[in-house]
Structures are given as structure tokens and as C-alpha cells.
């Protein structure tokens, strides 16, 4: 007889190989065809709501690995919340306006298109990009309302954004003023703080002499009767700002020195600089000198010095006063700061505080980076080309003390990677320290309070965002672009004042935009709204900062507080969101702008929690770079290894820091996946012939080890659900992996094989095991589903078609309509866990001894061994309670327990009996049945009799 055929060998259509790259597109198509997302919504209706508001990616270019990380994390959270019993929608969004798309249109069609044509082509381009990105996001297994996303360029969103502008204007936050803002010459526009990045750059660093003018006043400041000719010396890394100099700054508490030097410079023998900087400065200039007098900086206030280019061109024949400034330091330079208020924030603030009118501020640099033609010596030159010319002119004028090359970190445009300057322009601002008209706290105050009330994951994000808000300048709302939501103001042609009915007019414009998009503003004749007043007013041509677009989506999409605005998806979502989740750069981006708009509109943030993930780097910790050749595209990983591997990599990695990825790292993830898949295959195969409705064993009648396995499963489920609740995904993955490999694979399933394969197919022993396995399988699949979505769905379909096929009440469209599995109550769970934890420790010691004996060649497999255990009273009771089932737990052919006062002692010997050809145990009763001499008595009973007596394992 072929006894192998008498075994209950497992079988399942769930294949060992995942073939993920080939099979996953089929699941994506099936989810689309069967409307899985809509099924989830129907199953979740009426539950407590959980809102994750999607930070919109920009609608330009293919998605990269950072996008994949972001969307996978969001998908894990939304799926886990739905399965935890919430109604968690996922409405994806896209950021559609702004410079990058405008640049693409310019590249393709040139720079001279009419505005309306730029806008129509930009809309079409954005839609193309969205379609490409949407396909890639869906390929990652991300479920969402992909057919109805929110787009910042949807007419309703554009209209509501104009309404938001009206509300913050009405509250008193918005004002117009001349201020230095981040300016990109290539963009031809102001930049937001989040659009500026820093990179190393080499610039000329120069020491420049400003000649004395009123020597009598200078002498009095230093307590002298008179002074010779000389100059005060400044240090700067921006020679191009020298033509715009209007003041000098010194620190009131720093000591400044008059130094007589040799050889004598062009402007005279005396130099004025901070006393602490005299020695290094003279050494750098190649001069000798002695200090003849000192004075505190405050004594120098109001003294005037001649412009260093006065000798080179008559247009510079002016003087600059000294103002006091606490920001002056002695780290570098001379302790004297040159001030060009049009090109520096501190310079601007200082000069304005001393009464300089906006109209008197010198701003010769145009928006394209060139000096105005009328500027003496340098008119028409770009500021960068002018730098060496200015240095040469200073030298000819006798005002150049030193020029050196300096490598330093400098502001650059994040799009063009070109240098950015501060440039004073007339812009619209949201005031950080303006008190709103209702008398409430300032924007800065309410934003800082809002940060304190927000949960941060990880916790360090709070201090980072707090520091940014505490130190940031006013928000520059306006941009000088074409593809953006208009700041739809009517401005008086003579006074520059807004129309007195601006808030009302903004609503009228919004109603038009709601029907025709921002193009409606372009085509609007002011007379339609202003009548005869139209002759007095002009349309403001500025557009809103794109960070205002995305930063106001909590109102335009979620509907705002109490749903006042309605919102494009206000019915599905709610304000405030439970969570915003983005990369760490968004502390100064979307998190930041959303906080400010929320606080301006409602006095507090639009979110309850902020989750931050790090950037992706390669295996060596380097940033992804095409030039380095270390870029890993998510599309390539999906097409070769499968998106499931990307999902497992994301979930396995601590996202709070940098996420490392490489081919080697992905290989390790593949191995982890295979082990999980093999566990699932074993589980599915061994419940394939089981009917959950008609064959399940009541909990109280389950074998002891099966009850313990369920107690283990319950503990694991509680831990993993807790990790999901706290957004700690890598510990969740680790716990699932440990459960599969150690709790199941190396322990429970290893022991269970004998009972599953050798007992009668319908026996209580086997059905007890299958009952436990089905609970374990359902628990495991549902816990894995948020992460391993494709695999969990594949396995769920197999389970639904076999063990669960007769359950009438269970929806079978998808695993994602399920909630976490409800395990039976465990009255004895704690006692079981304590007992079996000790049993597992003893078993591990037995396995170690068995391995020693096997290595010595005394036995082949562990089943050839007979074990005697000598144990103290407590251990003896535990071991003896299993009776003959102890041998199945230890996977040996005999296990005998002996009482002993000492600690555990284990003796192992090779069995002298024959091996059963069916169960492979070495037993004394092999051959005692004449009809079946090759098998043991247990197997004879299981095949032809009443079955073996067994209740523990």
C-alpha cells in the first residue's frame, strides 16, 4: 500500500511563487472593474469618520520613489483605519497651478502667448500629467476615489480659493507694501520660503572703504579734538548691492576703533572698524597700525560717510548714515554692515525704522536680474556680470581694501537651481504680527498655539515647525505669473487703494470663476462689476502663491469649519482633518501654509495630527541623483519585483528618518516576502477542505495547543493594531514576520503537521487544528492587508472560495470591506500563555540538545530520538500534563518525564524501534498489525479504527 496517499497532504490554488509583477496589474484592473473602493465606502457607511487629507503632488512629470513612499504610507493608514472600524475615505488631489507648468508651456509654445491661451494649454497639460501619475499611483495598489480627485484647478476650487482670500482680507490680515522678497530672475516672480533651497556657491567677498565726511563729528564721537582723513570699512559678499547702499550698521554695544595705518590708503591714514576685528583685518590688508581711540557703536549713530564709488561717477556722490543694529556680529568681516534696503530684510527694516520712505529706497535691479539702464557705470548689466566690474570700479576709486573668493551656502530657486536674491517689490502680504479686526491674537500667536495643540509623528516635528513659524517673515501672497488663481482686486489707479466693496466684488468674481475658471477673470470687463467707477480702477494682475492654493484645500476641498464653504469633497471628508502626512520638507511647505490659512480663517489648524516621513536615499545614504546613477524608479520596481515589494519595503522601514533603498535592500525584502507567502500557503492549504460553518470545533473543545495558538494570535493582533493606531508600521511588520516565522513556522505549524497529515481527515483532532488555523489565517490576512494588499486579496479570494464559502453573512467582493477578525474570548488565555511560554523554553533546550546529538551522527531526524526529561516539580507538572502528546510537541518518537529536585536535565538516545513508513515515528508497535506491518499502531487506528486518543497537541 502506498501510505503517502493515505496522508492528508495540503493542497491549494495559492501558488508558492507570487509572480507579483505579472499578476498585480490584473488585481488593479479587477479592483477597478468591481468598484472595490465604492464597496468599501458602502461597507463603512455610518461608522466613525477618519479623515486623511491628501497633500497634493504637483501635476508635472512622472512619479518618483518619494511619491511612492508617500502614497503607500497614506494607503496603509486609510486601509488600516477602515479595517479598524472607521469610515476612512481617500480622496487624492493634485496641485495644478504655478511656475513648472507655465515653464513647460513656454518651452513648447514660446513666451508670447496670450494669457488666456497659456491658461487653456496649462489646463490641458496638467490633465495629461495627472492621468500619467494616477496610473502609476494605482499600480502601487493604492485604493481611492481616483475617478473624482480634487484638483486645485477645478473651477469650484479656484472659486472657493478666491472666497478664502476675501475672508482673510475681511479679517484684516492682507496688506500691500514694499518689502524685500525672495526673487528668482528666471521665474520673474517672488518665491515662497518653501521654494528656496540652499546650495554652495562661490562669490567675491570684498572689504570696502567709505570715506569720512564730517571729521569734526567723528572726532567728538571718539573723544578727540580732531581726526585725519580716512574711511570706515565694511565687508560684503554681494558687490552688486554696493550701488544701492543707503546706510551702514554698527552694533550699539560693540567697541569700535580708529586705527592709524601704514602704508597710507587712498582715503587717508585712519580706518574705522570693530576693535575685535582690527588684528585679522590689518593682516589681511597687508597693513600695520595702531589704535588711537575707541568708542561704543552707539556713539557713532548718525555719522555719515561718502559712498565708495563717489570718486568713480557723479551719480554716487552721496553719503550714508550709521544706524544701530543688534544683528551686527563679529564672526566675520569688520563689524560694520553695509545696508542696501532694497536687497536685504534687516537692511529694509532698519532703514524704514529710521524714516526712509518707500519712494526713497533705491532699487535699480529689474525683475530679470539686470540693472536699469540709467544706473551709472553698470546700467544694463546683469548683477552677476556686474560683480567684477563693480570690484574694478571700487579699486579705481581707491575704495577696495581686499577681494577674495568665498564659497558659501546661498539661496537658490528650487526649480531653476539658479541664485535667488532679496528684492524689494510692491507685493501683497499676509501679516504675521497683524492683529485681526476682531481683536483676536495675531497670526503668529494663533499659529504657535495651534502647533502646541497638534499631535506630531514623530514628535520632533513640533519644534521644527514652531521655530519656522516663530521666525518667519510676513507671507508674500502675490506672484507675477499667468497660470494661477488671481488676486482679483480692483485697485485705484491714483491712490493704489482697494475698492471699498472688495469683499463683495471678490464673491461676484468667484461666482464667475465657478462657471468659467480663472479665465473668467481675464475676460472680465471691469464695467460689468464697477459700472462708471471702472475708469478709476484697474484689475490687479497678480496671482496667488501656489502654496496658498494647496494651503487652502482644507477649505476648498474639506469645506472648512462647520462646512461653511461646502468644499468639492465636503460630503466625503470633514474639517479638521485627523491627519496630514507628507515629507519633512513640508514643514515649510504644505503643513506651514495650511496652518497659516487655517489660523487666519478659523483661529486654529486644519489638522489634528501631522505625520512626517524622511527622504529616500541609496544604500550608502546618498540622495537619489541621475548624475550619480543611483535613482530607483518605482515603475521599474513594480515591473520587475512587484509593487508589493515596494509596499513591504516602505512599511518595513523607519520612515521618521531617511529611507534607504538599493537593489540589495530590495533583495532582502523579497526574501522576507517569500517567507510570509510560504506561511500563508501552508495555512490556506491546510484549511482547503474545511467548512467553517459545519465543521468548526467550539472553543472549549479545542486542543490545548490550538487554544494557545489563538491566544498568541490575539496578543499579536492587539500589538499590530496598536502599531497601526500609532502609525508605527515597521514594528507592525516586524511583529507579523516574527509571528509567521517563530510563533507559527518554527513552533505551532511545525508541531501541527503530524496531526494535520496523519489523523483521520474528519477527526476531532484535525478539525480542532483547522478551526484554529482558520481563525489565525483570517486574523493574519486582515492585519497584512493594509501593507501586502495584493497578496492579502489573492489569499482572501482563495479562502472565500473554500473554508469560508458557506458563510452567508460575509461580503466576498474584497478583503478591504472586512474589519479586523474577531477572535473568540479567552477565559484561560493568560494561564495558557504562561504555561506554553515555559513549554516553548524547554522545547528550545531539547531542540538544542537534539542538534548536538544529530551533529554527532547518533540520529538522523529528531523523530529518531527518544527523550527523557528530569524536571523540578513545577516543570514536571507542566510537562506531565501533556501526557503522551508531549512527544508531538518535541517532535520525537518518545518523551518521558521524570521528577527531579534539580534543574532541568535532558537525556537523548536513538530509538531502537522501527520507523513507521506513514508517520515516520520510531515506535515499538510498528509491525504488530499483521495486515499492515509497515506502520505503527497509531496509524493503524487513524486509518482503520476509531482514531488515536489525543487532546493536548
From Swiss-Prot:
<dbReference type="InterPro" id="IPR013155">
    <property type="entry name" value="M/V/L/I-tRNA-synth_anticd-bd"/>
</dbReference>
<dbReference type="GO" id="GO:0002161">
    <property type="term" value="F:aminoacyl-tRNA deacylase activity"/>
</dbReference>
<keyword id="KW-0963">Cytoplasm</keyword>
<dbReference type="InterPro" id="IPR001412">
    <property type="entry name" value="aa-tRNA-synth_I_CS"/>
</dbReference>
<dbReference type="InterPro" id="IPR009080">
    <property type="entry name" value="tRNAsynth_Ia_anticodon-bd"/>
</dbReference>
<dbReference type="GO" id="GO:0006428">
    <property type="term" value="P:isoleucyl-tRNA aminoacylation"/>
</dbReference>
<dbReference type="InterPro" id="IPR050081">
    <property type="entry name" value="Ile-tRNA_ligase"/>
</dbReference>
<feature type="binding site">
    <location>
        <position position="916"/>
    </location>
    <ligand>
        <name>Zn(2+)</name>
    </ligand>
</feature>
<keyword id="KW-0067">ATP-binding</keyword>
<feature type="binding site">
    <location>
        <position position="582"/>
    </location>
    <ligand>
        <name>L-isoleucyl-5'-AMP</name>
    </ligand>
</feature>
<dbReference type="InterPro" id="IPR014729">
    <property type="entry name" value="Rossmann-like_a/b/a_fold"/>
</dbReference>
<keyword id="KW-0030">Aminoacyl-tRNA synthetase</keyword>
<protein>
    <recommendedName>
        <fullName>Isoleucine--tRNA ligase</fullName>
        <ecNumber>6.1.1.5</ecNumber>
    </recommendedName>
</protein>
<dbReference type="GO" id="GO:0005524">
    <property type="term" value="F:ATP binding"/>
</dbReference>
<dbReference type="Pfam" id="PF08264">
    <property type="entry name" value="Anticodon_1"/>
</dbReference>
<keyword id="KW-0648">Protein biosynthesis</keyword>
<feature type="binding site">
    <location>
        <position position="936"/>
    </location>
    <ligand>
        <name>Zn(2+)</name>
    </ligand>
</feature>
<keyword id="KW-0479">Metal-binding</keyword>
<comment type="similarity">
    <text>Belongs to the class-I aminoacyl-tRNA synthetase family. IleS type 1 subfamily.</text>
</comment>
<dbReference type="InterPro" id="IPR009008">
    <property type="entry name" value="Val/Leu/Ile-tRNA-synth_edit"/>
</dbReference>
<feature type="binding site">
    <location>
        <position position="919"/>
    </location>
    <ligand>
        <name>Zn(2+)</name>
    </ligand>
</feature>
<dbReference type="GO" id="GO:0004822">
    <property type="term" value="F:isoleucine-tRNA ligase activity"/>
</dbReference>
<keyword id="KW-0862">Zinc</keyword>
<dbReference type="GO" id="GO:0005829">
    <property type="term" value="C:cytosol"/>
</dbReference>
<dbReference type="InterPro" id="IPR002301">
    <property type="entry name" value="Ile-tRNA-ligase"/>
</dbReference>
<feature type="binding site">
    <location>
        <position position="939"/>
    </location>
    <ligand>
        <name>Zn(2+)</name>
    </ligand>
</feature>
<comment type="function">
    <text>Catalyzes the attachment of isoleucine to tRNA(Ile). As IleRS can inadvertently accommodate and process structurally similar amino acids such as valine, to avoid such errors it has two additional distinct tRNA(Ile)-dependent editing activities. One activity is designated as 'pretransfer' editing and involves the hydrolysis of activated Val-AMP. The other activity is designated 'posttransfer' editing and involves deacylation of mischarged Val-tRNA(Ile).</text>
</comment>
<dbReference type="GO" id="GO:0000049">
    <property type="term" value="F:tRNA binding"/>
</dbReference>
<feature type="short sequence motif" description="'HIGH' region">
    <location>
        <begin position="57"/>
        <end position="67"/>
    </location>
</feature>
<dbReference type="GO" id="GO:0008270">
    <property type="term" value="F:zinc ion binding"/>
</dbReference>
<dbReference type="InterPro" id="IPR033708">
    <property type="entry name" value="Anticodon_Ile_BEm"/>
</dbReference>
<feature type="short sequence motif" description="'KMSKS' region">
    <location>
        <begin position="623"/>
        <end position="627"/>
    </location>
</feature>
<keyword id="KW-0547">Nucleotide-binding</keyword>
<dbReference type="Pfam" id="PF06827">
    <property type="entry name" value="zf-FPG_IleRS"/>
</dbReference>
<dbReference type="Pfam" id="PF00133">
    <property type="entry name" value="tRNA-synt_1"/>
</dbReference>
<feature type="binding site">
    <location>
        <position position="626"/>
    </location>
    <ligand>
        <name>ATP</name>
    </ligand>
</feature>
<dbReference type="InterPro" id="IPR010663">
    <property type="entry name" value="Znf_FPG/IleRS"/>
</dbReference>
<dbReference type="InterPro" id="IPR023585">
    <property type="entry name" value="Ile-tRNA-ligase_type1"/>
</dbReference>
<comment type="subunit">
    <text>Monomer.</text>
</comment>
<dbReference type="InterPro" id="IPR002300">
    <property type="entry name" value="aa-tRNA-synth_Ia"/>
</dbReference>
<keyword id="KW-0436">Ligase</keyword>
Amino acid at each position: 500500500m502506498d501510505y503517502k496517499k493515505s496522508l492528508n497532504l495540503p493542497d491549494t490554488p495559492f501558488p508558492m511563487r507570487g509572480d507579483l509583477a505579472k499578476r498585480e496589474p490584473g488585481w488593479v484592473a479587477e479592483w477597478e472593474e468591481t468598484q472595490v473602493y465604492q464597496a468599501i465606502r458602502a461597507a463603512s457607511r455610518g461608522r466613525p469618520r477618519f479623515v486623511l487629507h491628501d497633500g497634493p503632488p504637483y501635476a508635472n512629470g512622472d512619479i518618483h520613489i518619494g511619491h511612492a513612499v508617500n502614497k503607500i504610507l497614506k494607503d496603509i493608514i486609510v486601509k488600516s483605519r477602515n479595517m479598524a472600524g472607521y469610515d476612512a475615505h481617500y480622496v487624492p488631489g493634485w496641485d495644478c497651478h504655478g511656475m513648472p507648468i507655465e515653464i513647460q508651456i513656454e518651452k513648447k509654445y514660446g513666451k508670447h502667448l496670450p494669457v488666456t491661451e497659456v491658461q487653456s494649454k496649462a489646463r490641458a497639460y496638467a490633465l495629461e500629467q495627472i492621468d500619467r501619475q494616477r496610473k502609476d499611483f494605482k499600480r502601487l495598489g493604492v485604493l481611492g476615489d481616483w475617478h473624482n480627485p480634487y484638483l486645485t484647478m477645478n473651477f469650484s476650487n479656484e472659486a472657493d480659493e478666491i472666497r478664502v482670500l476675501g475672508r482673510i482680507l475681511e479679517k484684516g490680515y492682507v496688506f500691500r507694501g514694499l518689502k524685500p522678497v525672495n526673487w528668482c530672475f528666471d521665474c520673474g516672480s517672488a518665491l515662497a520660503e518653501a521654494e528656496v533651497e540652499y546650495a554652495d556657491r562661490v562669490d567675491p567677498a570684498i572689504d570696502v572703504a567709505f570715506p569720512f565726511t564730517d571729521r569734526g563729528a567723528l572726532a567728538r564721537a571718539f573723544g578727540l579734538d580732531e581726526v585725519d582723513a580716512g574711511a570706515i570699512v565694511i565687508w560684503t559678499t554681494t558687490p552688486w548691492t554696493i550701488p544701492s547702499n543707503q546706510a551702514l550698521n554698527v552694533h550699539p554695544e560693540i567697541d569700535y576703533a580708529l586705527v592709524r595705518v601704514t602704508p597710507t590708503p587712498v582715503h587717508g591714514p585712519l580706518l574705522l572698524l570693530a576693535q575685535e576685528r582690527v588684528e585679522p583685518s590689518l593682516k589681511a590688508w597687508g597693513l600695520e597700525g595702531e589704535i588711537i581711540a575707541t568708542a561704543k557703536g552707539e556713539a557713532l549713530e548718525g555719522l555719515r560717510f561718502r559712498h565708495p564709488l563717489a570718486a568713480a561717477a557723479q551719480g554716487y556722490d552721496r553719503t550714508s548714515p550709521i544706524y544701530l543694529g543688534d544683528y551686527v556680529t563679529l564672526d566675520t568681516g569688520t563689524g560694520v554692515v553695509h545696508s542696501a534696503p532694497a536687497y536685504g530684510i534687516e537692511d529694509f527694516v532698519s532703514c524704514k525704522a529710521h524714516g526712509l520712505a518707500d519712494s526713497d529706497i533705491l532699487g535699480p535691479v529689474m525683475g530679470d536680474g539686470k540693472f536699469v539702464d540709467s544706473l551709472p557705470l553698470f546700467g544694463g548689466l546683469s548683477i552677476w556680470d556686474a560683480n567684477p566690474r563693480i570690484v574694478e570700479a571700487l579699486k579705481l576709486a581707491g575704495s577696495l581694501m581686499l577681494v577674495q573668493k568665498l564659497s558659501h551656502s546661498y539661496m537658490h530657486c528650487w526649480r531653476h537651481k539658479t541664485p535667488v536674491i532679496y528684492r524689494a517689490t510692491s507685493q501683497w502680504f499676509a501679516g504675521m504680527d497683524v492683529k485681526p479686526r476682531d481683536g483676536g491674537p495675531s497670526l503668529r500667536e494663533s499659529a504657535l498655539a495651534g502647533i502646541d495643540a497638534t499631535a506630531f509623528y514623530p514628535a520632533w516635528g513640533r519644534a521644527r515647525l514652531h521655530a519656522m513659524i516663530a521666525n518667519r517673515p510676513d507671507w508674500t501672497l502675490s506672484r507675477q505669473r499667468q497660470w494661477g488663481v488671481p488676486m482679483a482686486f480692483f485697485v485705484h489707479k491714483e491712490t493704489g487703494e482697494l475698492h471699498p466693496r472688495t469683499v463683495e466684488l471678490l464673491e461676484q468674481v468667484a461666482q464667475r470663476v465657478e462657471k468659467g475658471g480663472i479665465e473668467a477673470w481675464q475676460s472680465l470687463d471691469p464695467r460689468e462689476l464697477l459700472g462708471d467707477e471702472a475708469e478709476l480702477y484697474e484689475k490687479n494682475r497678480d496671482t496667488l502663491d501656489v502654496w496658498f492654493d494647496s494651503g487652502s484645500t482644507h477649505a476648498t476641498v474639506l469645506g472648512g469649519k462647520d462646512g461653511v464653504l461646502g468644499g468639492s469633497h465636503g460630503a466625503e471628508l470633514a474639517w479638521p482633518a485627523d491627519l496630514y502626512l507628507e515629507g519633512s520638507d513640508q514643514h515649510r511647505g504644505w503643513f506651514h501654509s495650511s496652518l497659516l490659512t487655517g489660523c487666519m480663517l478659523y483661529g486654529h489648524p486644519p489638522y489634528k495630527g501631522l505625520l512626517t516621513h524622511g527622504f529616500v536615499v541609496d544604500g550608502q545614504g546618498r540622495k537619489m541623483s541621475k548624475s550619480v546613477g543611483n535613482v530607483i524608479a518605482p515603475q521599474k520596481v513594480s515591473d520587475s519585483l512587484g509593487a508589493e515589494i515596494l509596499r513591504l519595503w516602505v512599511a518595513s522601514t523607519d520612515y521618521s528618518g531617511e529611507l534607504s533603498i538599493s537593489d540589495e535592500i530590495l533583495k532582502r525584502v523579497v526574501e522576507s516576502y517569500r517567507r510570509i507567502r510560504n506561511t500563508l500557503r501552508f495555512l490556506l492549504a491546510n484549511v482547503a477542505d474545511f467548512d467553517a460553518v459545519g465543521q468548526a470545533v467550539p472553543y472549549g473543545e479545542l486542543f490545548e495547543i490550538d487554544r494557545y495558538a489563538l491566544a498568541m494570535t490575539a496578543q499579536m493582533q492587539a500589538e499590530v493594531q496598536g502599531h497601526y493606531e500609532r502609525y508605527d508600521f515597521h514594528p507592525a511588520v516586524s511583529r507579523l514576520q516574527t509571528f509567521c516565522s517563530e510563533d507559527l513556522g518554527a513552533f505551532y505549524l511545525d508541531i501541527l503537521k503530524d496531526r494535520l497529515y496523519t489523523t483521520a481527515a474528519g477527526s476531532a483532532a484535525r478539525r480542532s487544528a483547522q478551526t484554529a488555523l482558520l481563525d489565525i489565517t483570517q486574523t493574519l490576512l486582515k492585519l497584512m492587508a493594509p501593507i501586502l494588499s495584493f497578496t492579502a486579496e489573492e489569499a482572501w479570494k482563495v479562502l472565500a472560495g473554500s473554508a469560508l464559502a458557506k458563510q452567508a453573512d460575509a461580503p466576498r467582493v474584497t478583503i478591504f470591506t472586512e474589519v479586523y477578525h474577531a477572535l473568540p474570548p479567552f477565559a484561560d488565555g493568560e494561564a495558557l500563555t504562561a504555561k506554553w511560554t515555559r513549554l516553548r523554553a524547554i522545547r528550545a533546550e531539547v531542540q538544542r540538545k537534539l542538534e548536538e546529538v544529530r551533529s554527532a551522527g547518533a540520529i538522523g531526524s529528531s523523530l529518531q530520538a527518544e527523550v527523557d526529561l528530569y524536571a523540578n516539580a513545577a516543570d514536571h507538572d507542566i510537562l506531565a500534563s501533556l501526557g503522551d502528546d508531549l512527544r508531538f510537541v518535541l517532535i520525537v518518537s518518545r518523551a518521558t518525564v521524570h521528577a527531579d529536585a534539580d534543574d532541568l536535565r535532558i537525556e537523548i538516545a536513538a530509538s531502537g524501534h522501527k520507523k513507521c513508513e506513514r508517520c515516520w515515528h520510531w515506535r515499538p508497535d510498528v509491525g504488530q498489525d499483521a495486515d499492515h506491518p509497515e506502520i505503527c499502531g497509531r496509524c493503524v487506528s487513524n486509518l482503520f479504527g476509531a482514531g488515536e486518543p489525543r487532546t493536548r497537541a
